[in-house]
């Protein structure tokens, strides 16, 4: 009688240990979504897009959501952006938080990705390379106290941005 009880106690102890280890090593699932960087469409049909090109159709947008618009009226099939639209959303997603409220839209022009500010000023990025440096150069140009108006900032060479025109007032500082 003692041997079967000892075996049963050992099995129970091993089962308890196994369950304790299983509980401690089991990881909980976590949904990680990219932050919204732009919108597709307008009004109640607008859909958010993450900085990685993921369509965030489930994310509710309110009238207060101030995301820049991409030049599409509806999301593409497949749930992700590709090509020049993906390049645009990568540029928008890399924008510093202080500049995001000023971003109106993006399009792919002759020089590559262009971002238009709400004031009408155009930021010409070219491709989606060196985004941190290009956004720093854009912020520095927009904060330059010697400027009161301009039309564009060419950021192809972020170390030497080209500034042109005088048709649009600079946005107020954040």
Regions found by a protein language model. Give the residues of each.
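Charged, solvent-exposed interaction patches on well-folded alpha/beta domains
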Residues: 2-174
